[in-house]
């Protein structure tokens, strides 16, 4: 599934321009690849497991 990966607290992973950082974070969570989506300032991944993708309806993020 494509989408924003989550940290352990349920929030998205912030970034500014670092595609390598985001790609690493996505692969660590068993995704295929990832990049920094500048407009949302968050990492975006392709091919993540369903339970690793941020969903505002079920998120536990309180940031």
Swiss-Prot record:
PROSITE patterns found in the cross-reference section: LCN_CSAB
UniProtKB keywords: Disulfide bond, Ion channel impairing toxin, Neurotoxin, Secreted, Toxin
Localisation: Secreted
Pfam families xrefs: Toxin_3
Tissues in which the protein is found: Expressed by the venom gland.
InterPro entries: LCN-type_CS_alpha_beta_dom, Scorpion_toxin-like, Scorpion_toxin-like_sf, Scorpion_toxinL, Scorpion_toxinL/defensin
ATP-binding recorded as keyword: no
Molecular function as annotated in GO: sodium channel inhibitor activity; toxin activity
Listed GO biological process terms: defense response
Superkingdom, natural source: Eukaryota
SMART domains, per the entry: Knot1
Disulfide-bonded cysteines: 11-61, 15-36, 22-43, 26-45
Further details from the record: Main studies are carried out on the Nav1.8/SCN10A sodium channel of the grasshopper mouse (Onychomys torridus) which preys on C.sculpturatus and has therefore developed resistance to venom-induced pain (in contrast to house mice that are sensitive to venom of this scorpion).
Function of the protein: Beta toxins bind sodium channels (Nav) and shift the voltage of activation towards more negative potentials thereby affecting sodium channel activation and promoting spontaneous and repetitive firing. Only when tested on grasshopper mouse channels, this toxin inhibits Nav1.8/SCN10A sodium currents in a concentration and voltage-dependent manner (IC(50)=680 nM). This toxin hyperpolarizes the voltage dependence of Nav1.8/SCN10A activation, as well as steady-state fast inactivation and slow inactivation.
Similarity comment: family membership: Belongs to the long (4 C-C) scorpion toxin superfamily. Sodium channel inhibitor family. Beta subfamily.
Name recorded for this polypeptide: Beta-toxin NaTx36
Organism of origin: Centruroides sculpturatus (Arizona bark scorpion)
Native organism taxonomy: Eukaryota, Metazoa, Ecdysozoa, Arthropoda, Chelicerata
């Amino acid at each position: 599934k494509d989408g924003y990966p989550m940290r352990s607290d349920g929030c998205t992973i912030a970034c500014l321009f670092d595609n390598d950082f985001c790609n690493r974070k996505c692969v660590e969570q068993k995704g295929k690849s990832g990049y920094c989506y500048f407009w949302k300032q968050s990492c975006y991944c392709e091919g993540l497991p369903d339970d690793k993708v941020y969903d505002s309806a079920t998120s536990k993020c309180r940031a």
